[in-house]
Structures are given as structure tokens and as C-alpha cells.
Amino acid sequence: MFKWVTPASTATLSRCTLPATTAATTTTTAMAATRTATTTTRTTRPQLLSIALTSLIIIVASFVPTTSGFRSIETNGGGRKLFGGYRITPKHCRATKTLPSSDPRANGPTICMFNHECAQRGGEVVGACMDGFLFGACCQIPPTHELASTLINEAQNAYFQQHQQQTKLQQSAAQSSFESYGEQQQSLSEEQVAQQPSQNIYDQQNLDKVYQQLDSSSSISPPNGAYGDEPQQQEYQSESEQPVRDENAYPTSSSSTEATQSQSSSASVEFEQEPSQPADASNDQTTQKINKQPVQPPNFHVHKHSVTINSPSSPPQNDDFVMQVLSTLPPEHADDHHIVFTTEVPTKITSGLQDQTSSESNSFEEVSSTPAATQKPKPKPTQMPTQKTTQKATQKPTPKPTQKAKPKPVPQLAESMKRPIQQKPQQVAKPKPSPKPAQSTNNHHHNHLILDGGEFTHSDITHPGADADLVEDLQFSTGYGPQPVYAEPPKQQQQQQPAEQSYISSSTSAKRPTTGHNSPTTVSSITTHVDSIESIILQLNNTSHGPSYNVVSQQTPSYGYPGAAVVQTEPAAQNPTFYQENESEKVQESDSQSDYGYTTTVNYESFYDKVSDEQDASAAVSQSAEMPTARPGYGEDVSAVLEDHTMPANGYHDAEAPVAPQTSEFNKMPVMGIAYPVDMSYMEEEGNLPATAAGYGQMSSDSYEASTESTYQKLSTVQTEEPQPTYVRPTTNANKQNRPVASYIGMVTMQHYNPQPGNGDYQAQVPPEVSVSSHTTKVQEQMDETSNGYQQSETTSGYVSPPTAVPAPAQRPQYDAVQGDASSERPVLVTASPRPRPKPSTKRPAVKRPISGESTKKKPQPQPSAGAYNQEKISEHSTRKPVSNGYDKVPESPITHIQIKKPSATQHKEQEQTGYPRPASPAGYEQTTAAAPAPAAPSLNYDKPDAPPSQYDQPSAPSASYDQLAPMPSLNYNEQHASSPGRKPSTAKPISTSYVTGPSTPRPPATVDYHYDNVPPLFMADDKLDAFIQSTAENIVGSTPGNYQPPLVATASTPAYAHRPTSSGSYGHKKPGFVQINGTPKPPRPTVLITPKPTAINLVTYSSLSDDSNKLASSTSSYVTGRPGVQGVSSNDFKDPGYFGSSPVHVAFTQSTTEAVYAVPSDDKPAFPGYFGPTPSYPAFSVPGEKVGQNVMEETYTSPNDFVNFPPVRNPNLNMSAASSAVTSDLDLSTPAFVEDVVLKDKMHTLVHKLVASLQGNFEALADMIEEPGSNKTVATYQAGAGGTAKPVRVVTTRKPVRTATTTRPKVTTKKPVTRVTTKAPNKKTSAVSTTTRKPATRRTTVAAKVTTTTRRPATKKPTRRVSSTVKTTTVSSARPADDEIVDEEDEEDVNPNPSDNEIDQGATLSSYGGANGRKIHSTSRTLPTPNLAFHSPSTECGVRPHVKSGRIVGGKGSTFGAYPWQVLVRESTWLGLFTKNKCGGVLITSRYVITAAHCQPGFLASLVAVMGEFDISGDLESKRSVTKNVKRVIVHRQYDPATFENDLALLELDSPVQFDTHIVPICMPNDVADFTGRMATVTGWGRLKYGGGVPSVLQEVQVPIIENSVCQEMFHTAGHNKKILTSFLCAGYANGQKDSCEGDSGGPLVLQRPDGRYELAGTVSHGIKCAAPYLPGVYMRTTFYKPWLRSITGVK
């Protein structure tokens, strides 16, 4: 209801403003609405008007609560504490269910679901713990992917359309009333305008403060208020009028010239400007007024009051959440242009109220600036883009008044372009920027603060970045495109659309959103999205994705258009020209814009029309562009958002494609919840600042920071006046890491602009740009988890600053920068482009530049500032801080700088080409990220920006830098680049984002189309993906931003490849992206997915699938290669195998391969060897050859099945492919993952033949053979045979193995084995040899498992007597000896019942696969045997394995029963035991205590149960029963920090001591000074077999090398994460991510064998970013560090 009303009212407003006169009235209306309280009487004039006002008020009222509710939701939902004191789902992951249905996010980009379900839907887990699969993790589904499949989405779409129609009607009705009201209001606004300049600063600050407080409801409003009448007018008009304007604008915009400029500028600034325009355009009559506006600070004042009350304003905030989804705004926007894409709608509503919020949410800050500019541009709009550009600066004051009325529609677009200039000349504009920041801030603040404030951390847990994104995303529930919901951008677009057409509108929207989206990205950072673990750590998603959606949106823009990328590069240079040529070269510009997904936005300002043309030109790309519409509005924002949230961050990044890919999944994380916190602190600081004029911006910033995402959007809305600030938004993007910070920066910048620039000095705009920068930073952060992103972020900030000078350009530049960055980082980040912008008109600046005046301004700004630019940068960073007022004051900046420092460094790097590469370095990036994450860090970041300012001065360099940024990722990007030349920057980021990218690209095309149509088309593209997007898009429909994603999705299929590249950059992060990687460049990307960890790898992968494979191969080892080669795409598709057809094929192939691979180990073998080879202690794969024999079987078996079956990456091997491609496809995991060694295979084959022969007659001989040769040799052979046997089975098994080897095995084993075993067992008994022989045969049938068992059996047989004399037999015997009882299961000992035995055997076999492998390894040190024998007195023994005779288990496969007797399964029981789920792993250390992870603490009203001696959780394959004990109490480490997983350790005290047995043995504690660095350790658990994969039924084991902490830290940096590896952490895994622990393994043991054959506990599974992702090794709690604590409680020695 609420939503509906809001839409209606908004729509009404919108309607009213639609006509030119209406525009004026709208302005008034908006103002009136803004000051509903103040001007209620006036509103009475027109009944409709009063009604509209009433609705607005109601909306405001509802929004305020809603906002509060949202906050709480953010806090509650986001902070949902599922487990003990910490919420498993990232805060941004508030499950869609918690969102109002109207919330676009409710579509489910982030839904609480099991990780494997998430993976199946191509989503990205943004907030899962290692045990996420057990509980539900925040799954960010690529809008395209998931939404499409979501009924809700469809419903939403339908609703949206319906809503839009209704809204239109309402709007038309309200239009008339609003017109009169608007006129009325306009006069007021005009009056106010005069005072606005003086009051601007103060009001802004005050408003900011007030709004920050109001945050949710006021927040939006404040922008208007902050702006004062004019701002409000603009904003409001933006909202109300925008639609009008849009309509007008459509026609006006229609004129390509005007449209182009208007669209370009307007897109980002349009909304903001709209209000201005209303003053201007609306005021044809009010022309004077507009002039006055700049002069009237009072307007601000009045607005302040009204703003506070302003319904529209406040609704937008809520809208972000509710409205966003709600069509309300969209309807308005629909009127506007349907630019109000559904996705954008929410923001749009927010925006609508403050148009900027949504659209410019990210860009809106820029818009904010621009709004002022807008006004100026307004007159300008009439002029050609070029003229506009020039006029902007020059004419701004004059033309504005003059052309105001007429240009209004176009002007908006033009304004957008001119915004920067406008802002400079116009004080109003400038104040507006300030207000805008305030609004943005508020919006963000609302969301961000809340999220940031408390929830931040949580996200961090899973995915810091995601968290941050989520936080911001909160507004956008999932942070995918919809969130950005910058309805505004769409609006602008709408206006633009007129000029260009819907398409352009779309494009504009997308692009604009880019700017705004940067901010929104921040806001968007919802996701989360973080990949699950990645989501957890990084996102700990991405990636993302989940998060894909946003990403998609964003990404698309980024390289939605090939041009986008180009724009980045070319546009940088070209853009300026284009900008100027805007109209004439629209198409080209479009290309440029294409280049920048976001860049487009930036470009948009300059050449919205062009963009549209280009979009038209490149429909597919266009989609991207269109997407940009959504994307910018949300693309960028979303990008950031998504990225942050879901890898979506990556997705967003995709917009920035280059950056996003790099961090892809990590980006999300990087966006760092940490960044959030930083933001928060910033916010707080900024909160103070708001007091000052700078404060306004700062306030905004503050809000921004706090609710960067939300606020950003909202702020954007508020700042609608300050489009330039939108640039700031990009800054935010740039700071994405500090997402909030960045946002804030932008905000602050705006403020600075306002205060400092005065209106004339567009430095004020610089801050807006900074704002963008901020946003960009955010995006970058998100996008870039990679250093690129971050640096970009910095850069963006810097850029943003300059843009401040040229708000419109800033905005545009933002995009440009972003694009450039985006290329490298997130398009938004590219905002940094602004840096280049000044100088590199060439790059982004060009885009901005086109704004001519703006460009000049921009440039001048940077130049004037050179110090100023620097300052701007500082300010930008600083801006966030107090610098706001001191934008000019670089000094203040410094503080900000400090915050930005890191980014700065990054930026610096980024800026410097060299720098960029460095950013490319995850380390730098990470730092940036870190900076973002830590408020303090941000300070540093900011500081650095100080330096960057210099660089900023040389934006050109930065531009190059960006390119260079791209360079690092260049490989990827280049590929991407190839796809979209402009995208080159993409190259920088893409690495990380790589995988995300894939998916998103496809989407854009679809989106573009429907985006084009605005609402209706919105849903059309990519139904499935688009469906997902649809809902999003639909939401976004109003605002193209949403469409953004869809376009990406649209391209998903093959086109995806083509488009994907575009998407890729932005989308790269998206986890879904993996699959989507199809982007043309993506094909390689898929592989990239596989290699997400290493940037380099990504790059390579990026290059081409083959390359990818190679890369993987080289990086990973053969195994990777094999797998990638075979499944390069598959991998990528893996996630979306379902989503994308490609995957299936691979899967099939893989399956075949599995068998084949198994058989043809050479192929996969390389891949597996990497996986498996390492798995065993044996580093060499050849060694595995022996063990691999069985192992291979096992692995192969496990691999396919495991991957398919269990998401747990417990089987890192499985995860190998997943790592890069993160379980891109089942095949991926299956065939390649388990290829062990060719030698093994050969042996197996030979053995199999032998076995077959022997089975027929010489089973005894076989057994003897096994025993005599020294279990090792024989065993190996035997096993090999078994393996061979298994192999054939395996083929079948492979499929079956969905559960992967383990499951399959168990199943096969269980069923077949039992029967066979039983039958055979007797035979066996009769003739042990004979039986054995037979059994193997049976086993064979069973699947390799049996064979494996067979091997064991022989051992077992001996073991029968083995207990006494097991030395020889020991190998097998040992394992079996303790077996005696166990023997039957492991051996075919007649002692135990055959069936059981068989079953167990099977289990053993399964285990055998892992365990057999171990046996194979036949670490003959049958040390175990001794333990086995000794085991009879388990009470005195620890670390022994009575059931296992072989030394080690080769990793990544099912282990054997009793192989890890200390393994505990921690289950959670809820509802009095009605529901139980496997939550985590654990380690038995004494008869009464179990160690697990702190994040495994029980949820609300839940209790934990510890199951000892468990092996097959699906059935009873064990010879011995497991023992279940209730947990009496959970002792969580006091210093446990869910945000960083510090001290992630907990002790479970059992209600009664457990009786030790052969299958229940405690683990030994390591020596206090033990150092396991460089050794191979074994991780066991029932966690997912691969990231996003399924869960195995039998215990899985994986061998991983323990890495030195410093190396681990470096690896994380390389992957673009700034995660700090503490001394209490222990890292284990491979650089190429072959194997790793995964969700569900949490709390499980990481053990090593001591010289005496016993096993000791090196660490417990804690967390990781994704699972087995390149350069993201798993993180464990170092046992030696916690021994004192453990000893103090348990007394263990």
C-alpha cells in the first residue's frame, strides 16, 4: 500500500512536471512537495496537488517509518543474527523475504538460501560462513539469472508495469494540479533561489545534519532542502518534474543535440538538474528565477524545512528500499521515461522525490552538483551539447535563466552535461551539489550508516565488501541493478531519451546511473554478494554475485558497450570531443559511453544522446549502454552495490568491467565491510562536517558514508542538484572500498563545492566529482577488490574532485573515469577518470569534457586546483571528511586524504600508469580496500589522495593509469577490451571480476532492449536472466539501471560472450559472472573464473578460454589446465550451467571426461594432479600416481560427483575449477578436478584388468600380491586396479556423483556394495582371496569405490590376523587392524557382517578413494597400524587411525570410514529437534570437548549436537555406529570478531563424555612451538565440494600445503583483498586455488601426521573467500596460538 501510494504521489509529481510549464510547476511542485509541511496551504490550490502533497506527506511519513524500518531491517535484516551473536547472512543480504515486495531487491538478488542452491541459480553467496551451506547464505543472484526465474520477479514486473500505467494516469491527473502548484512553488523556489547561494552552505550543512538524522525519510528530503528551493525544486522537480521534463525532455531531448547533452549531463545530473530545470525549464517564465536561484541561499533554507518534510525526499530513501522496488517511482519515472526503471524505481522514488537520489544516487551526487549545473545547463540544454558545454560554464548563469524554461527538458540532459559548468557558474547549482551530497548522504546515511554502523562488520564476516555493498545495498535489497534504482538516472535518461530515444534514455539512465550508480554502487553494494566464502571473506561475493545482478547492470555499462571500454580509453581522449561533438558524434560518444558502462554515464552528461545513439548503434552493447542506464543509475551504483554485495560488486565492476573482474568475487569483499566501517567513521566525521558548508557535502558525505549506498542513492537524490557530486559518487565508487567513504567524499566534495567553489568555482563541482569518486571508490572497492578498483577508487576520488569543478563532466568523467577505471576498475571508479578528466579529457574527461564548459571546468578545476584538483581529490577524500567545506582547502582534505590515503596510494598508482599496475596488485588494491574498510585506513586513503591530487592534476596520466590499471588486468581486459576496445580499463579490473563478468555481459543486451522501452521492454530481454533482471530491471524499468543488468543477462548466452566482455569488466565480479563469463572476451574469462584468484591468471583466462586453461595449467599445474581446457567454459558456466547452455555441454563432456578423464588422466589429470597431486602429502603428482590410482578413481569419482553433489569445497580439488570458475560447472568439478595421475590411471587400468582376471579366479593371488609386495606396492597396484575398475563405474558414477565421489560412492557403495558385499563377502569368507577378488569386481561395479575397497580388503584380510601381525599387511592391515571391527567395513573381513562390511567397505572404499589413496600412498609408515593395535586403548591414544592402514589420503575425495576418527559433525537442532541441519565440522580433542568455529555457534532457539564417528551422513555405510552427544554449552572465544573472523574458535562441551572407539579417537595437540609451514596437511569435512557446489554425503578430505602467513597475506593482496592475516591465522591452500576447505567445513580439522604416525591438529577451518579460489587460500585458526586458551578450558595437553 505504502509503496503504491508513494508511486502514485511520485508519479503525480512526475506527471505534473512533465510539461514544460509543468516542468516549472513541477519544480514548484517538487519544492512544494519538499516543503509539503511548509507549503501545505499552497498545495491546497490544486486538488490534485494537495492530494499529491498529501500522498507525499503520507509517503514521507510512511517512508520515515519505513526508512526506520528499513534501517532496522538493515540492522535487523542486514544484521540478522542467525548464529549466536552473528549473522550468517551479510547484512546486505537481508533476505529478499525481509524486503517489502515492492522493493526491487525483494526480487531476490540476495536471498537467504543454501549456497549450493545459490550456485545452481548462478548467484553469488555474499554472506555465508564456511558453514553457509548449512544455514543459508545470502545469495545474490544475478538479476538476469535469478530474477528471471523468480516468480516474484515476474510478478514484480507485472506489478511494475501495472503500477507504471497507473502511475502514468495518476501522474497525468496530478500533472495538471502539480503544474499550478509547481508554478506556485516555482515562484517560491525562485524566491528561494536567490537566497540559496548564501544559505547553500549553511543550509546544506544543516540540512545534511537534519537529513542525516532524518536519514531515511528526511534524508531524501534534505537534498531538496539542502539545495534550498532551487535544489529542492531541482530535486523535487527532478522527481516530479523530471518525469515531466523527461517527457518534455523526451521531445526536447529528442532533439539529438539537446538530448545528447541533456542526456549526457542530464542523465547523471538530469534529475538533480531537473529541479533546477524546473526552475529553469519550468521557468521559462521563471528564467529569472533560476538566475535568482543561484543567488538565493534562502531557497536552500526553505527547502531545508520543506525538505525535511518533503515527502518525495523521504520516500526516496525508503524508496530506495521499498520504493525502489515499488513501481511508485518507476511510474513517475515511467512517466519520466520509464527511465524510472523498476529497479531504479525505488531509488527513483527516492530520487523521484529527489530524482537524483536514484539516478544520481551514485551519479546523483554529481548530479547534485550538476543540478546547479543543470540549471545553468538548462538554458544550455537548448544549445547543442557543445554549446551547452561551453555555455554551461559561460552561459550557465545567463543562459540558464534565459533558456531555463525551454531547455528544461533538454536542459536536463544538457544540464547533466553541463552540470559541472553549471555548477560552477551557478551558485544555486553549487549549493545544490552540496545539498545533493546531503541528500545522497542522507540516503546513504540512512542505509549506509545503519548498515555501516552496525551491520557492516557482519558482512565483513562473509564478505566485507559484500557487507559494505550490502549495507548500501540494503537500500537496494540485493544490490543488483535494481538497487541503484536510481530512478533518476533513468529519468534523466528519460529526458535524454527524448533526445536520443527511449534507448538513449535507457543508455543515459544506465550511464547516468553509472555516475549515480557509483554511488548506488555503493548503495548497491548489497551484495554481496559476495561470494559465499568469498562473500564471507571477500564477500566472503561477489562477486559476486548474487550480486551478479547489480554487477550485471553495472558491468554492462562498463563494457556493456564495447565502446564503453573504448570510451574509457578512447573516450577519454575521444570523449571530450565527443562530448563537444556530442550531438554530431552521438554514436561515437555512445561508443565511448559504451566503453564506459558507467563511463557512459559520465559521457552521458556530455553526450547522452550520443550514448543513446551508440546504444542504438550497438544494441547488444547498447544494452550494455542501456544497461548503463540501469547500470549507471544502478549500473554503476548497482555495480558497486552488486559488486559489493555480491560479487555483484564485481558485477558492478563489470560496469567497470576491468576492475570488477579483478576482484570479481573478492571485490565484493573488498568493498569491504571494512570499507564500510571506514565509511562510517568517515560519516561520523563528516557528520560533523555537515555543520560547515563543506559539512553539507560532508553531511551528505557523512550520510553518504554511513549509508553510502542508501544514502548515496538518497543523497544522490538530495544531491540531485549536484550532479557533479554525483561524480563524487563515482568517487565513492572509487572508494568503493570505502564505499561509504568514497560516497561521502563525493558528498563532501559536493559540499566543498558548494562552499568553496561558491557557485562560480566549480571546484565545488570537483567535490561532487569527488563524490563520484567516492562512489567510484566504492565501486572500485567493490569492483575492484583488486587494487585496480581501489586505486581507481582513489583515482576516482581524485577525478571526482576535478569533476567537481566540472560537475557534469565530473559526472560524465566519472563515468569516463569510471569507465576507464571501470575498465580497470569499476566504471564508476573510472570516475577517477575525472582525474583524467581534467587532463584526460581524453579519457573520461573527454566525456565530461564534451561538456565543453564542463570539461573545461573540470579541467580547470583540476588545474585551478591542480592544487584544487589535488585538493579536490583530497577534498574528495577529504570531502568525505571535513574537507568538504575545505574542498578548496586542501588542508582539510588531508584528513580526508588520510582516509583516502590508501586509495590515494592506489589512486596514485592508479593514476600513475605505474600506479595502476600497482593497484592491479591486489596488495595496493587491497590496501585501498583496507583503507576503505577501516575508517582510519580511509583516512590514509584520503591522505594519499592528497598526493593523488597531483596526479589528479594530471588526470591524463591517471587516465593512462587507468588504462594501465587495466593493464594489469590488461590481459583480461584486453580481451575484454577486444570485446570493447574502450573497455580496456576493464582490463585492469576484470581479472578479479573475470568470472563475474561473463554473466553480466549477456544480460545487457537484453536489458538494452527492454531498457530501451523503459518499462515494458524492461522485462523483455533475457526472460530468464532477464526475468531475474526483469524484476530488477522491471524495478529498474523505470530506471534503465535495472535494465542494465538484464542487458548483461541478455547477452548471457553466446551473445553473453560478446557482451559479456562488456559485462565482464563490470560484471566480472559477479559470481554468476562465472558462467556468464561467456562475454565475448569472457570465453577466456570462464577460465578466468577458474583463476579468479590470481589476477594474472584471470588475465590469462581472460585472454581466451584456451589461454585460460593454459594459464590455469601453468598456474595450477597441469591439472588446472586440463580441466580448464576441457571445462574452461564449463567452469564458467558451471555456475550457470543451468543458466547458460554452455555449461551443460561441458558438464556432459566432463562427465564423460570424468570417466574419460579418469581414464584419460592426461587431460584432466593435469588439472587433477594439481588438485589431487597436492592433495596427498605428496607434492608431486607422480606420487599420487600410486595413491592416485585409487585416488584418481576416488577423486574422479568424487570430483564429478563431489562438485556436482556438494557445494562444499571441502574438496578443494573439486574446487579447483571452482576456484577459478568457482565451480563453474559440474563437469568442471568433476572431470578435471579428479584427474589424478596418468601413471595412476595406467596402473589402475592394468590393475583393473588384473583385477578382473583375478576376480574371476585369482582373487587370492591378488590379495597375496597386495600383501606381499609390501602393502604399498601391491596396494598401490591393487588400488590402481581398483581405480581402474572404479573408473568405468566412475563414468556412470560421475553423473551420479552429483554428490560427487563421496556421495556417489557411498550410494553406490552403500547399495551395491552392501548387496554385492554381502554376496561376495561370504565368498570372501569362504576364500578370502577368492572373495576378495570377487569383491573387487563387485566393488568395481559399485564404482571405483568398491575397487578401492577391494584393495583394502586384501589388506583387511590380512588384517583379520592383521591385528597380531600387521606389519606387512599393516598397510592395509593397519588400517583394518583396528578395524577388526572396522575391518569388516574396510576389509572384507569375515569378522564383521559382510553387508556391513561391504557397506563399510564401500564407505572405506569411498574413504578409500580418499583413504585408499592414503593407503595407496601407503605411507607405509604403518604408524597407523601401531595406533590401530594400540587403539584398543583409545583412551590413551590420540591422533591414531585404527581403521586406516595407509599413511595418507590423497586429497579431494571421499575418505574411508574411520580414516579421521577425530572428525566431528556439528549439527544444529531447532524447534526442539524438529529440524536439524549439518552446520559445521568439529574436532574431538578430549572425551568431553570438541573444537569448532565460533561462527558455528547455534542460532536463536537452536542447540548444537555433536556426532562422533560419523562418516556417511546420508546412510549407514559405517561398520560402527556414530555417537551423538548433545552440546551442554558453547564456549565462544571472547575476542571472536565475526567481521574479520578473528579468534573464530569455539569449544563445545558435551553433555557426557564420549566413549572412544576405533572410529572415535581424539586428535593430538601440536607442540607449542610447532611450525607446519610448507607441509601438506589434510582438511576433512562434509562441506561443499566446491564453491556454490553441493554437499557430499561422505566425509571428504583434501590435502593442502600450509602457507607462510606473509605469503598468504601477499596472495590475498594479489587477489585484491586487503584482508589482514593475523598471527593467529594459518593459511593453507594453493595459489591457483586447486583445493580448499569450503562452507560446511567450518570448525573442521586441518591435521598433519607426526613422525610417529599420529596426527596432530594444525588448525581448524575458519573461513575463506570463496573456496579454492586463486590467491585466496583457506584461513584456519592456528592451534598453537590457541593452545593456552584450549588448555585453560579443557586441560588438553
UniProtKB/Swiss-Prot annotation:
The EC number(s) attached to this protein equal 3.4.21.-
Keywords of the record = Cell membrane, Disulfide bond, Glycoprotein, Hydrolase, Membrane, Protease, Serine protease, Signal-anchor, Transmembrane, Transmembrane helix
A Pfam family annotated for this UniProt entry: Trypsin
Q: Specify where the region named Disordered lies, as residue ranges.
A: 170-198, 212-321, 352-465, 477-524, 615-635, 752-1007, 1057-1090, 1297-1435
Q: Where is the composition biased (Polar residues)?
A: 178-198, 212-222, 274-294, 502-524, 771-799, 951-962, 989-1000
Quote the subcellular location field of this record: Cell membrane
In which organism is this protein found? Drosophila melanogaster (Fruit fly)
Recorded name of the encoding gene: flz
GO CC term (a single one): perivitelline space
Instruction: Give residue spans, biased composition: Basic residues.
Output: 836-847
**Example of a GO biological process term:** lumen formation, open tracheal system
Ranges for domain Peptidase S1 come to 1449-1691
The superkingdom listed in its UniProt entry is Eukaryota
Q: Which residues lie on this side of the membrane: Extracellular?
A: 69-1693
Enzyme class name: hydrolase
Q: Where is the composition biased (Acidic residues)?
A: 1380-1391
Q: Which GO terms describe its molecular function?
A: serine-type endopeptidase activity
Q: Its membrane topology, per UniProt?
A: Single-pass type II membrane protein
Q: Where mainly found?
A: membrane
Disulfide bonds listed in the record? 1480-1496, 1608-1627, 1638-1667
Q: Where in the sequence is the active site?
A: 1495, 1544, 1642
Task: Identify the SUPFAM superfamilies for this entry.
Answer: Trypsin-like serine proteases (SSF50494)
Which protein, by its recorded name, is this?
A: Serine protease filzig
- In this entry, the parts of the chain located on the Cytoplasmic side of the membrane are 1-47
Q: Which residues are glycosylated?
A: 541, 582, 1215, 1272
